[in-house]
Structures are given as structure tokens and as C-alpha cells.
Amino acid sequence: KMAEMKFYKIQEYVEALRKRGMFASCELYGKEENVIRNLTYNSKEVSEDTLFICKGAAFKPVYLREAVGKGAVCYISEKVFELEAEVPYILVKDIREAMSVLANLFYNNPWEDLRLVGVGGTKGKSTSVYYMKAIVDDYLEAQNKKDSAVISSIDIYDGKSKVESHITTPEAVELQ
């Protein structure tokens, strides 16, 4: 399932949001059939055929203009932005909730192929996670399988490479 990426049309993102009760409205300017090949909320990561997510209290319209200049073909937001060109947009009730639906569709529901464990609490989460990882990895090694992955406030290990964590709760787009 993870081998080949399937891409979806703008209209399919609208339908996914509508199904989950997150859709508010949209103006697609006849571009509903355009295929989305990139999904991001970071204007520095925009490329051709990007669905750009306008999120956060610090979001500035200049980020959206930069994204459109780099190839964003549609944006999703809680409000409409004034732009020079007719850029399709999708309005949602809650951008953070909508991000999980967008990421799920864009990455073809990768969670369906995973077994997940979540740890919450006030103290000892990372310690508990690394104890669990050691136990699970011993089991996986005995089965001739790959190491387990981990996302913590210390680092993120996807089974291949490890990077230092910079935030305690990654966004849905990164988690997928």
C-alpha cells in the first residue's frame, strides 16, 4: 500500500471534509479537477500543485502570496484572503481538525497499516516510551522484523533515520 502514492483532486478534498462535517464553503473557480501533488502549511515547502494550509495565530497573508507564487493551486483556511489572482479556496470550521483529514487523504491513510501506542500523562512519558520501544524491538528482532518507530519530545525515529524533536506535538501533516 505504501509503495505508490495516489494523488487526489481538489474536489475529493472538499468531499472528505464535507463527510467529516468540517467543510464550511469553497470557491474553486472551475479548478475542482486539479490534482494535488503536495500538501503543506509551510510556504518554504510549496511546489507545483500544492494545497496550502493557512493555519496558526501567527499566519500572515504574505505566506499565502508566497505559496501561490511557488505553485500553490488551492488554499484551505478558516477565512478568505484577498489575492491578486483567482486562487481556489476551501473554508473550514476548524483548520487544525481539518489538517488531519487532509493529511489522511493525501498520504492514503497510512495509519491503517500501523499498530499504534499512545502515552499521555504529566511525567515519565518519554521514559515509558523508550522502555516500550526496547521491549517491542527485542520482540521484532526475534521475528526478523524492523525496529519500531517512535515519536517523542526527545526525537523522532521512523525506522530508518532519527531526528531531534523541536516540538512536543507534531502536526497531522508530519505524523502521516
List the predicted regions and their residue ranges.
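N-terminal leader/targeting and accessory segments in enzymes
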Residues: M2-V101
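Phosphate-binding loop of NTP-binding sites
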Residues: A98-Q176
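Short intrinsically disordered, low-complexity coil segments enriched in acidic
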Residues: K1-M2, Q176
